[in-house]
Amino acid sequence: MKKIVQNKFIAACLFIAVFAACNKDVEYVAEPLNVSEEMSYVKVIHVAPNFTTLTTLADKVNMLYTTSNGMYEKINGTTLAYDNMFPTATNTYVAINSGLIPVRFSIGGVVLADSINFYKTSLTLRPGKKYSYFLTDNVTSSAMFFEDDVPVLGNDQISFRFVHAILNDTAGKNVDLYSVKNAANIYENISPTIATGFEKKPFYNNDTLIVRRSGTGFELARINGLTTVGGRSYSVVYRGNGKVTTSTAK
């Protein structure tokens, strides 16, 4: 039986969203976000494939924050399951108050809107800044909360970061991100829970990007036909189940 590790790529741009699982094409395009210096902006991404196994809870997650009047308000719309994010690509961030903001995660209920709270924390949000919160298999960790500090770009530039969001891969956790077109690694030896900073990069025109075991040619996941647009900032997210093997690729 051919052994294929079931990992996936998301190429999720801040301004253009591109979702890919192996060889899927571009699906969504989003407009640039208008930013107010009085608010902060948050996106939540569910990349925990083993959420139900680890928590024994239904995989229908809500993220809520405390408003200025002390009430909790949902960040997301419909509940999130694995491989979902909110806002979707056509609406890139949720605007909420700045400061030290208590947040909680709950399970969307049938009778009650939020029947079970399973995690509480506080986030420090700076005015006018954008953030991404990745819900991983370490569901009670705030380690994957990042400021999306993108550089100022000209129309002939892009910025790019790589996010390693697979926490349940026991063998060879660190990975490289390889560009077929350039025949070279873009990033090397990236550990789980790490997001590189946004870096200015040349355009990618119909390139294939491959996640490989660090220091080897062993392929774990790929995205085919990646073409970028000048003036945009891209997040490429490596997520999925690092322990699952199967005879066919998904």
Model-identified regions with their sequence ranges:
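Intrinsically disordered, low-complexity polar regions and short flexible loop motifs
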Residues: 22-250
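Sec-dependent bacterial lipoprotein signal peptides
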Residues: 1-23
